[in-house]
């Protein structure tokens, strides 16, 4: 009883006390937007007021004259990521031998040994008693990710031009050199893999001198794998690569270089600060969208996200907003940001050219019930890669799916791997196709990306003036001994020779105009096979050309299978049609009636195969001499099969489509 009375007294006393003043108030419906905006900004600024770390104090003491922003540029598999690891180890950013390919963060990058996303890292290097702030960008080498490379150059003042001592200058070395040269980057020649038995550094240096007119006397010969001579690179970077230009006293001007999505923080932006300073609590505005944001956190990649109090002019780092940017479409690559109120004082920076999808595939879930999961998985990956185009599509054979556009075939393959590895999506992918342009007699133009939309009936084709397909200018480098075979391959793929150059006694640079449709049809695989893996390839868009293209369809019992249709050149129709019907026959189960598989262009059948039906022995119980009864039963069975074929649906398992569409 006494305990109950004490509880009542305690409760009465508590109720008489004044309510505590809460520091963080709940949502007030009558509060003005500006009050809420300023209160969020003040809270973010208060949260950012922490004592600076030793790293921050060292960075704060470094003037912009001792900043160096650089990237590593090379052909695929010439050792960019391995060299990045050695530089990070030498500057104390990571522990020696702690990780391989630190900047290759995706599983597919580690598995394939390639770089897909450009990654950044900040390093501190003490040279002659003074600290230098080095900012490294590890760029992709493959042509499909050219947009990643060109964006990376915008945040750099120089580049290490890396060449494999055993392979020499390759096609993408040439392409990436011209990209860097056009942006005015200071180039430092570096020869890698000098420890290999097949290494020939002198030949590689001669190629760099003759191809790029670089001063090879300043070249550094290294082995990124063993660490040989890598220490000599750091003084070379400090002495040869210029400091960034910027003024931290001017109004804020930052360039959005890249972005990625974080589940908890929303969209995180990778920025290059050209002028001014940016810190948590600042209110910034986008020139592209006009939307305003409050900076929640700024920091550098060291090599992971490391928060900082402020980012100054010349630095490259990350920023995310509070409240977070939830729609990745708001983060437009190449956009300029400044502080609210400084819009008229700042000239926006020139942006980047938007990458265009050049290769299209259709993706369908193996199980139609998994469509929502596939859609969610694709949307998650799009947050980190907005160069992919997505359009919903429906197929009678495979159900709901998506028409996806990519920068190239490797880009498509990497996306498929990420869907399966990171999201467990089990999908059916159609062979890659390219867009085509239709010029109508009415004067209109239409670009179609799906074979389903291609006009193949007579009435539609009568309205067409001409069809066009995209061409690319390809640059191939390979040993001279394979010249005849490579020319034969290019000519067999409707190519037109542009130039032929012997840039050393044994190496050839061959340029061809090729239809993009031929290039995506495993051209690179055939090229590698012909040259025993010694060839390299690079390409760039070369416009549209008139072409005699048609839509090739697959018919099963006279019903078109829309998921398998494809736009091809007339010279390929007979060969491809024969391949289709032969391969599809292997994967279709027998039915109670005959299945006719045909390849057709319009109303013309170009190839045919048939799957024989199961046969029931209706004569088993008859006497051998009963000829009349025997004939009657056989005729009845024949009529029954005709009726079944007329009304029966051919059941084709999804596994059959998956096997047929695979290489």
Swiss-Prot record:
Residues 1-44 form a transit peptide. Residues 65-245 form the tr-type G domain. CDD domains: EF4_II, LepA, lepA_C. It is found in: Mitochondrion inner membrane. It is an enzyme of class 3 (hydrolase). Pfam families: EFG_C (PF00679), GTP_EFTU (PF00009), GTP_EFTU_D2 (PF03144), LepA_C (PF06421). The keyword ATP-binding does not apply. It is a peripheral membrane protein. Promotes mitochondrial protein synthesis. May act as a fidelity factor of the translation reaction, by catalyzing a one-codon backward translocation of tRNAs on improperly translocated ribosomes. Binds to mitochondrial ribosomes in a GTP-dependent manner. This is Translation factor GUF1, mitochondrial. It comes from Coccidioides posadasii (strain C735) (Valley fever fungus).
